Amino acid sequence: MATSCNLADRQCTPCEGGIAPLENSVAAVMLDTLPGWTLDGQRLDKTYVFRNHYEAMAFVNAIAWVSHRENHHPELIVGYKDVRVRYWTHAIGGLSENDFICAAKLEKLLEI
């Protein structure tokens, strides 16, 4: 079974379509390793709340770094002190392991 720790240690694999989205049962098992994340249809979703705008924007920049390294990019909705992150794999119209890998990497960033 995947844990958040070992998901964060994995690398995303390029996905250009041609595979099926994760089955709901597999996505549910992976979701259990990611505290605070929810499934919103075929999207992985979490809102992070920070003490101020500076911290929220610093986190957005950290997300950009992870996204660039993994070549897997979330939808971001940025508020004054909050950042909503939504992952899904556009090429397959649903969830892939890449979504969970990136979510786990974001969780690891905040383990301070």
Curated annotation (Swiss-Prot):
Quick one: signal sequence residues? Answer: none
Single Gene Ontology BP annotation: tetrahydrobiopterin biosynthetic process
> Which keywords describe this protein according to UniProt?
Lyase
Q: Which Pfam families has this protein been placed in?
A: Pterin_4a (PF01329)
The molecular function terms in GO held by this entry are: 4-alpha-hydroxytetrahydrobiopterin dehydratase activity
The record, for SUPFAM superfamilies, names: PCD-like
Residue ranges annotated as coiled coil are: none
Q: What is its EC number?
A: 4.2.1.96
Please give the InterPro entries that the UniProt record associates with this protein.
PCD_sf, Pterin_deHydtase
- Catalytic activity annotated for this protein? (4aS,6R)-4a-hydroxy-L-erythro-5,6,7,8-tetrahydrobiopterin = (6R)-L-erythro-6,7-dihydrobiopterin + H2O
User: Is the keyword Lyase assigned to this protein?
Assistant: yes
Spans through the membrane: none
Question: Which family does the similarity line name?
Answer: Belongs to the pterin-4-alpha-carbinolamine dehydratase family.
Name-wise, this protein is Putative pterin-4-alpha-carbinolamine dehydratase
Q: Which organism is it from?
A: Dechloromonas aromatica (strain RCB)
